[in-house]
């Protein structure tokens, strides 16, 4: 799969490492000087320095031909705009990390009208996992199968 990752923080870096090891064609974008270039030297990925929400930067990363664009910067708005831009360029699927509770009620709109395939709030997902464990303590041990798609 052709995958573009916007934002090379902890999440973006971990995704790039994992996906490139699986043999995917990965491009990474980060606006901090040298970050994308260093990661490209470490991993088999294309590294691009720039604003991941910018049309021209996404064109460099070939986001329009991507099967998946993942926006995992620290900025919710940057992530949403990056995904909207990628979708307009032709990306098949987009995932945005959206942490602010302010956007909770707008997720359906963002998916239907703005082209987001999926939005993920890591804090909300963690809270749900903890609540599930508290309801069913015997389920505290979770095994993953099918490359993490089934728990």
Sequence positions of predicted segments:
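Cytosolic regulatory regions of ion transport systems
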Residues: 1-151
